[in-house]
């Protein structure tokens, strides 16, 4: 494959992964096991080890394979990176910025004791309820665009589609909002703030009214 494209894809994935690992590690330090996984491992007739394989590790491995298809294809594609590839880099950079800024804003918000029990209606969170999830989807869409410039990269579109679906409709947004829905002020926040794609408040409110 083209050396520039290979290095570009590697750099994009590495930068995204290192930032996310640092953020999750710092946020989770000293807080014990993720309660979602703990509940999953306790429920059902199968033992914890079997449930971990069937419902955590195996699905994550399959998801990783599909989501990384653009990277796999991009590593073997011939031909130089053209204008579409650099559009992909711009989309990736936009997504990474949304993730990083959104996470930083939320961390600062939670660090203030005065905000305990309130809704983070600040910064990027005024335009989307999940700027970090939107950013994650944009990151992998950008990586797909870099790979889609050459054959067979265009065939790897299931990667960003699956990632976006999981974040917007699957295990990401849906599970989080299920636990947040009863927090004071959160339902009002949902009515005036876009659920995924960043939108101005007036448009989000109008769409919510039209949806009934």
Provide a role label for each language-model segment.
Residues 20-37:
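Active-site neighborhood of divalent metal-dependent phosphoester bond hydrolases
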Residues 32-55, 118-125, 195:
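Juxtamembrane helix-capping/reentrant segments at transmembrane boundaries
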Residues 1-20, 24, 52, 62-105, ...:
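Hydrophobic transmembrane alpha-helices
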